[in-house]
Amino acid sequence: MAAQQQGRGSGAAVLAAAVLLCVLLHAHVAESAVFTVGDRGGWSFNTNTWTNGKRFKAGDVLVFKYDSTAHNVVAVNAAGYKGCSAPGGAKVYKSGNDRVTLARGTNYFICSIPGHCQAGMKIGVTAA
C-alpha cells in the first residue's frame, strides 16, 4: 500500500513538472514579437532607418514582404553588409514573404540583386 502511495506521488510530480514546462515554453513563444520590415511599404529601398525606435530581442521574427521577381533577402555578416556582398553559403530568401528569427547580436540583411544594396536595400537589426 505504501508503494502505491509513493507511485501516485511520483506521477503527480511528473505531471506537475510537465505542465510547468509547457507553461514556460508557451510564455517564451508568446514573448516573441513579429515585425514586418519596412512596415506597410515592405522590404524596399531605404529601409535601413526602419529599425529606428524599435527594440528587438533574440527570438523575434522579421517578415520580409517584397516582389520576389525583383528582390531577395540575404542574411550576411558585417563585412557583407558593409560591402554589399553575399559571402558563399549565405542564406538567400526569395519567396517574397520570408520569416527570419533573430539571433542575439546584430543580424544583417541585404538584397543581392545588383545595385540594390548599394541603393540602400539593406538593414542591420540588433537583438538583445
Cite the ranges covered by each PLM segment:
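N-terminal "mature-chain" segments and other terminal, solvent-exposed stretches
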Residues: G42-F45, G53
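Beta-strand acidic-aromatic groove motif in beta-rich domains, primarily in extracellular
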Residues: H71-N77
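Extracellular/periplasmic metallocenter environments
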Residues: A2-W43, T69-H71, K82-A128
